[in-house]
Amino acid sequence: MSHLDLSRIDLAFGSHLVVRQLSLQLEKGRIGCLLGPSGCGKTTVLRCIAGFERLAAGEIRLDGEVVSTPRHMLPPERRRIGMVFQDYALFPHLSVADNIGFGLRRDSAAVRNARVDELLALVGLAGQGRKYPHEMSGGQQQRVALARALAPKPSLLLLDEPFSNLDVELRERLSYEVREIIKAADTTAILVTHDQHEAFAVAD
């Protein structure tokens, strides 16, 4: 059984159909990719998977559970999905450690701190938890965003053009690093990109 299953989904804005009859299956632990030019509906598909947009037709299942149909939407907070955006979306007033631990506020301080330290090491930023986002480079900020998304151990990770704000050299290096991090975390993920090189560097 697929971990993520999109079955003949349609997505529309008003009367305008932006995605028609899309089907996709992704096995647990694999990294998939939606590759295409800007404006073709890739990000809209991610928003539908995350629970922010309603289907016009079809069905989405996550780990066997129906999470979206035209008449049913499981709320985003109950889907256990992590997201990484192209603009990092870090909280500027919080330290790196507090950004990463933001989704772990229900855990005890000891559990939260241990998880944050584990993730800082995983993304190659051990010992830098007290810094603030403005003190980090673009590549480091994107790693912090990835660590924050991975912190609650999501069932699925969605990456929406995560390297588009980085220069070409850093983008190429970070794409391989991100793949290694996702694999080390044993996480299922989908990358959205318009860049063929990124697609082949990150996805299975």
What are these regions (language model features)?
Residues K131-H134, P152:
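Conserved signature/switch motifs of ABC ATPase nucleotide-binding domains
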Residues L157-E161:
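Catalytic Walker B motif of ABC-type/P-loop ATPase nucleotide-binding domains
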Residues L35-P37:
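The feature captures the beta-strand-to-loop junction immediately N-terminal to the Walker
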Residues E65-S68, A110-Q128, R179-D186:
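Conserved ABC ATPase "signature" region
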Residues V66-G82, R106-A114:
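ABC ATPase NBD coupling module
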